[in-house]
UniProtKB/Swiss-Prot annotation:
<feature type="compositionally biased region" description="Basic residues">
    <location>
        <begin position="257"/>
        <end position="266"/>
    </location>
</feature>
<dbReference type="Pfam" id="PF02476">
    <property type="entry name" value="US2"/>
</dbReference>
<dbReference type="InterPro" id="IPR003485">
    <property type="entry name" value="Herpes_US2_varicellovirus"/>
</dbReference>
<feature type="region of interest" description="Disordered">
    <location>
        <begin position="353"/>
        <end position="418"/>
    </location>
</feature>
<feature type="compositionally biased region" description="Basic residues">
    <location>
        <begin position="395"/>
        <end position="404"/>
    </location>
</feature>
<feature type="region of interest" description="Disordered">
    <location>
        <begin position="230"/>
        <end position="304"/>
    </location>
</feature>
<comment type="similarity">
    <text>Belongs to the herpesviridae US2 family.</text>
</comment>
<protein>
    <recommendedName>
        <fullName>Gene 68 protein</fullName>
    </recommendedName>
</protein>
<feature type="compositionally biased region" description="Basic and acidic residues">
    <location>
        <begin position="353"/>
        <end position="369"/>
    </location>
</feature>
<feature type="compositionally biased region" description="Basic and acidic residues">
    <location>
        <begin position="241"/>
        <end position="250"/>
    </location>
</feature>
Amino acid sequence: MGVVLITVVTVVDRHKALPNSSIDVDGHLWEFLSRQCFVLASEPLGIPIVVRSADLYRFSSSLLTLPKACRPIVRTRGATAIALDRNGVVYHEDRMGVSIEWLSVLSGYNHLNSSLIINQPYHLWVLGAADLCKPVFDLIPGPKRMVYAEIADEFHKSWQPPFVCGKLFETIPWTTVEHNHPLKLRAAGGEDTVVGECGFSKHSSNSLVRPPTVKRVIYAVVDPARLREIPAPGRPLPRRRPSEGGDARPEAALARSRARSVHGRRRDAAPPRGPAGARRPPGGRRDVDGTPTLGSVRPDIHTLKGRGLSPVPHLALWVEQWFLALQKPRLYTHHRLALHNIPSILKGEKREDTFEDNRRDELRHDDSRHRRHRGLPLRARSPPQCQPAPPRLGPHLRRSRGRGGRQLQRRGGAERRA
């Protein structure tokens, strides 16, 4: 089944920008977010896979309790980096063999969607800065959930996402709720809506303490492909700004769309329909008066007479087939025989075309073509009402029977015709 949901856990500054690397953020804030991620990973939305930056090893003690296969890491600063001192804080990385290593989040995402592992639904959690989260928004399609802590400071080096956190997508502030409902949001009216709540109440032993530098914790659902807000359940769809592709005056846009639809109907009027109850034959086209056009369908005259309809207006269809038979007589032999049968059909008689009739007509055609080539007079055709006589072959042709059946063979034996 693969990855069914992606949740990004990160930090943003007052400009809604992400830090370039994990070392640009205080370690206590990463510890707070890692515990938030550990709490949320218990929701029943698939097998949790929490991937983080390798330099957050010291601040991810709560995530180390997960199975080794569920807590991979990505070494964003290279394979040789082990520790980095920043403002007196040492950011240690995982030692070799402590955790499963991915080359990137994209490679791990493709691995979870491949057939190399068990086919199960996976919920991918991404904990880190822009060096880890940026490929998730740029290279992995589809909407994603975001959980980020907003601080009042400003990062020296940052990355501004194209969807601008908190501006183009609706955000929901997180508050603490009862410990038996860790993933629900307490609405203003007293009703609970399942959208994603984090934290425990003061009665819980694992209460989470928010760092003083954090203004608020935000939950949002973003889709960089659409670049518009996705409202929470029960909330109306917000109006888009002109910079986002919306209209400054929605009433004027609605009036213009109505005017275009009215003018379009006047300019492109629908063609008049046939009489009520008239059914269009399958695969056929109708003329202005409702009759099938030439070449559209080949109606059955017996069916028309059985329904009380006159077959005479449809004789033009057989006339057209007659001209086609003159151009390609071998392919349209059955149409020519059907044209010969018209007089008997109109009299109420029913005559079926047989294999002998088709074969006799082919032999007559071969003899006529040969006489035209030799300059000999053509033989007269028999009337269509009676049974046509078998054609007489010229003196230079003889009838022979071989393994392939009846054949026309020259006496010299140089040429054969099937």
